[in-house]
Amino acid sequence: MAENGIKHQEVGHKSLLQSDALYQYILETSVYPREPESMKELREVTAKHPWNLMTTSADEGQFLNMLLKLINAKNTMEIGVYTGYSLLATALAIPDDGKILAMDINRENYEIGLPIIEKAGVAHKIEFREGPALPVLDQLVEDKKNHGTYDFIFVDADKDNYINYHKRIIDLVKVGGLIGYDNTLWNGSVVAPPDAPMRKYVRYYRDFVLELNKALAADPRIEICMLPVGDGITLCRRIT
């Protein structure tokens, strides 16, 4: 039971905080007042989409935007775009000559946010590729000139391929660079008992997320930090 009598009825709630009121306080006090107008517009447009649960939360968008500025990221990659909220957060953070290689299997969703991204004046930073990411990653890895060239890589896509992505992008991110894996607390399901009520998609991907978390914790090539922001994000800093 959460504060004020609020109870999450099932695993699959967007906020990991036990108090909806506390999460709303964070949004209204810290996030929404400082949210760029373009990100607000895209967030509101995305909220009308039937698959709006796929979007990056506003607090995570704020976090990513600041993180990219702190590490002075310039060459970045995003696997899984949806309507482009996190992509826009990235594009606004990196310098004018920065680049984002963005990949998603559905261009139609990306085009929902594209007019807003264009209006924000950052579309020139984005190279969008429609289709599965693994073939593109294999091609990049094959050319050793691409090794260690990315400052930041954000993964928010098919959870059953996260480990396959990690095997490839670990070579592409520079030593000292960051990889961010989204949804690593997966609606809180990572600590839920097997018989807990879960939405079908949450239950399906749960074991893949658990497998990823164990693999990242055991990978000596990275330092990690798992944060309860949004639906959980694990930051991996490459050290070798």
Swiss-Prot record:
> Does the UniProt entry include the keyword Methyltransferase?
yes
Reported tissue expression:
Expression steadily increases from the bottom to the top of the plant.
EC number(s) on file? 2.1.1.104
Q: Which SUPFAM superfamilies match?
A: S-adenosyl-L-methionine-dependent methyltransferases (SSF53335)
Biological process, per Gene Ontology: lignin biosynthetic process; methylation
Q: In which pathway does it act?
A: Aromatic compound metabolism; phenylpropanoid biosynthesis
Binding residues annotated for substrate, in chain numbering:
14, 156, 187
Induction entry: By wounding and viral infection.
Q: Which UniProt keywords apply?
A: Lignin biosynthesis, Magnesium, Metal-binding, Methyltransferase, S-adenosyl-L-methionine, Transferase
Q: Where does S-adenosyl-L-methionine bind?
A: 56, 78, 80-81, 86, 104, 133, 158
Cofactor annotation comment: Binds 1 Mg(2+) ion per subunit.
Q: Which reaction does it catalyse?
A: (E)-caffeoyl-CoA + S-adenosyl-L-methionine = (E)-feruloyl-CoA + S-adenosyl-L-homocysteine + H(+)
Required co-factors: Mg(2+)
Which annotated residues bind a divalent metal cation? 156, 182-183
| Gene Ontology molecular functions | caffeoyl-CoA O-methyltransferase activity; metal ion binding; S-adenosylmethionine-dependent methyltransferase activity
Superkingdom? Eukaryota
What function is annotated for this protein? Methylates caffeoyl-CoA to feruloyl-CoA and 5-hydroxyferuloyl-CoA to sinapoyl-CoA. Plays a role in the synthesis of feruloylated polysaccharides. Involved in the reinforcement of the plant cell wall. Also involved in the responding to wounding or pathogen challenge by the increased formation of cell wall-bound ferulic acid polymers. Methylates 5-hydroxyferulolyl-CoA more efficiently than caffeoyl-CoA.
Q: Which family does it belong to?
A: Belongs to the class I-like SAM-binding methyltransferase superfamily. Cation-dependent O-methyltransferase family. CCoAMT subfamily.
| Protein name stated in the entry | Caffeoyl-CoA O-methyltransferase 5
Q: Which gene encodes it?
A: CCOAOMT5
